[in-house]
Amino acid sequence: MVLLFASCGQRYEAKQLVKAFVKEHATEEIDISSFSDLDSTKVISDSLLQVMRQQALKDTLFKDVKLGAIPQSTTLLYIRMRYGEDSLMQSRTFYFDKDLTGIIAFK
């Protein structure tokens, strides 16, 4: 039961980080329709993180992007944000360190 509350709290915290990021960096108004569950992965390499970070700087949906440092841990957390109209639904996946101190990459 405690684990369930911890994961709900982490999901809420991740959603708040993404909402704040969108509010601060979006180049247009983004209508967020939903978020996935918060999950973890160990398959994202440092080189893939670097590529995602470089691509994030070129993403025209966001401006003046500032990302957190790449963590030493091999475990990352991620959440998918869905936005847009039903016929044009799009998504971005945001990656965090395991302590949710900030967004470290997105795609």
Regions found by a protein language model. Give the residues of each.
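Sec-dependent bacterial lipoprotein signal peptides
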Residues: M1-C8
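Cystatin/cathelin-like cysteine-protease inhibitor module
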Residues: C8-K107
